Amino acid sequence: MKVYPTSKIRNIALVGHGGTGKTSLTEAMIYNVGTTKRLGKVDDGNTVADFYPEEINRKITISTSLVPCEYKEHKINVLDTPGYSDFYFEVAGSLTVADTMVMVLSANAGVEVQTEIIWHDYPDMPKMVYVNKMDRENADFYKSLDDLKNNFSENIVPVQLPIGVEESFKGVVDLITMKAYIFEKETGKVTIEDIPQDMSDDVETYKEALIEAAAEADDDLLTKYLEGEELTDGEIKKGIKEAATNGTAVFVFCGSAINNIAVTPLMDFIVDCAATPEQNQLIKGKDIENEPLAAQVFKTIADPYIGRLNMFRLYTGKLKAETTLYNSAKEKDEKIAQIIIMTGKEQANVAELYPGDIAAVAKLNVTSTGDTLTTKANPVVLEDIKFPIPTLSTAIEPKSKGDEDKLSGAIQRLLEEDPTIRVEKDAVTKQTILTAMGDTHIDIVIEKFARKFGVDVITKEMRIPYRETIRATVEVEGKHKKQSGGHGQYGHVWVKFEPFTEENFLFEENVFGGSVPRQYFPAVEKGLIEAMEEGVLAGYPVANIKATLYDGSYHSVDSSEMAFKMAARLAFRKGMETAKPVLLEPIMNVEVEVPETYMGDIIGDLNSKRGRVLGMEPAGKYQVIKAQVPLAEMAKYTIDLKSITQGRGKFTMEFAQYEEVPAQNADKIIEKAKQEKEE
C-alpha cells in the first residue's frame, strides 16, 4: 500500500445500531475501489471486515476492523464498529481516533437506541448520516429524516434524495451537482441523468436548505445570503465543506449498501468535504508534521500465534520503521520494528507513516490500549480513552481442573485485548469472577477462551460474599484439655466478645495475676483470627468484633501455643452462638442514568430490589438516580435495565458498606448454605 501524506487521509468511523449495514457499507466501499473482486456479504460469511468465527457464526460485528480504502488519490481509513451495546468499548476506541463519524441508519427503522446513545456521548464530533437499506420493505427516507430532526438538535440537512423506494429504489438526486445518479445493482456502475420531473418540488425545497446550511458555516457567505444574493456553486461547496468539518450541519445520504447503490457519492463527499486529520480538535492549528511525535493505541489484538498487535493513530510527527519510541504511560522504551497497515485481518508493511494515519505494530512489550507512544526527548501524554464500565458478573472455572494455569494465562491475554473485562478472585467465596458488558459479551469471552487458548470454561452463579457478626456482648469460656500419655495439651481462656464497628477485628488482653502467661497472648489472637474465617450461621467470614482476653489458666507442662489456639477457637464458637449472630450483606452505591421517561419504572424497580433511592440529578436530557442496593439484588441488573429502558440506560456501582440482612432473607441464605455444604 502507498504511503499517504496527511492531506490525503480521511479517518471515518462507521457507527450505529446493530444490523443497520455498517459492514455491508464497508464491503461496498472496498469493492468499488478494487480491493476485493466480489461484494462481500455478511450472510455469506465472506466479508473482509468480519473475520472472527464468533462474528461469522452470529452474523454480527464484535470487533472493530480497520479497512483502508484507496480512492481518488486519497486513503479513507474506514473503522467498521460493532452496533451491539455489549461491544460499545470498540466504538469508544474508534471514535477517539476518527475525525468524522458516519452514522448508519436503517431506512425502515430510523433512529434506534445505539444511534441515540452514540450521538449523546459524542455531541461535538463531526457527523454524517447514511440512511441505508432503501431497497427494503417499509423503507422511508423522509420519515428517517424527520426522526433525526426530532431526536437531535443539530441542523440535519440531506445532500441526496432517493429515486424510487423499496424494490424500485435505483439511485439518488445529488443536491450539490443537481443531477440524478442511477446505479446498477452490485456493480455500482452509474448513469448520470436529469432530475426526474416529479421530484422538482422536493429538490427545490431541500436544495434551499442545503444552501442555507452552507451559508451559515461562513460569515461572508451568510452575509451575502442574507442580503439576497445568489451563492455560486463554488461558494456552496465551500460552505458545505466548512459545515461538515466544524459540525454546524449533519449531512444526510441514502442508499443500499448490500446492492452497492449510492455508495460512491458518499465516498466522494468524504474525500471532498470530510474533516482532514489536521482539523482534529486535539491538534487543530498545529504544524503536526513537525510537532514532537505522539501516537495513541486505541485497540489491542491478542493472538496466540502472532502475539500482540497494537492499533494506533499517529497524531503528530512522522514515524519510520525500525524506530525506538517511548511509552509515556509506562515510562518504557518500545521498538517499532515494522509499521503494519491492516485491511481486516490482512497485513501489509509500509516504511513510514505520516501524521493522521492509522496503523498497527506487533510485539511491543508493555504497551496497552490507551497508552501514548512518543519520544523520550519530547514526551507527550494524551488523555486516556474513556471506556464504559462493565457491570454484569458471573463466576467462571475451567471445565478441567488441570486447566487452571491455562485459564490464568488466557485471562491475562484477553485483558490486554478488552478493556471492559474485569477478572477478580473473590477472597470470601473463592470464586473467579468475570465482569463484562452483557450476556453476549460473556458468551464471546467464553468462546474466545476455547478458540484462542484451548481452554473450555464453564460459568456458574456468582456467590455473594456475605459476612457474619454479633449483636450482643457475651463472656465465654474456652478450654482445650487432652491427655494421651507423656505431655498433654492444656489451654484455658475466658474471652469477652462484643460488637465493634470501627474495624473488622480488635484483640485486647486484660489479664491480671498471670492466669494466662503473656507468651500465649499471640496464640489466642491467632486462634480467634483463624476461627473468624467461618461463622456459625452459614460459614461466612466474621467481621466487626472486639475480643478481650481477661482470664483463664495454664499448666506448666501441658500448656502450649497450639493448646491456647484451640482454646480460643472453642471460645469463639461458643461466643458466636450466644451473642445473637446475624448475617451481613454488601450494599452497593448505584448510579443509574436514564432518559426522564423511564424514571418511574427505574425507581419502582430499585425499590423492589430492597434499594434506597438517595436522590436524583439532571445530566443533560438524562436523569441520574442515586441509590443504595444490596449486591444480591444487582446480579442481573445489566439485563433488567436494558429491558426496562430498551437499552437506553446505563449504570455504575461500587461497594458502600455491609448491612444486616433482613431476617426473612437471611433464613433462605442460611438454608441454601447448609444445603450446599451437605452436597
Task: Describe the function of each predicted region.
Residues 1-679:
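Structural and coupling elements of P-loop NTPases
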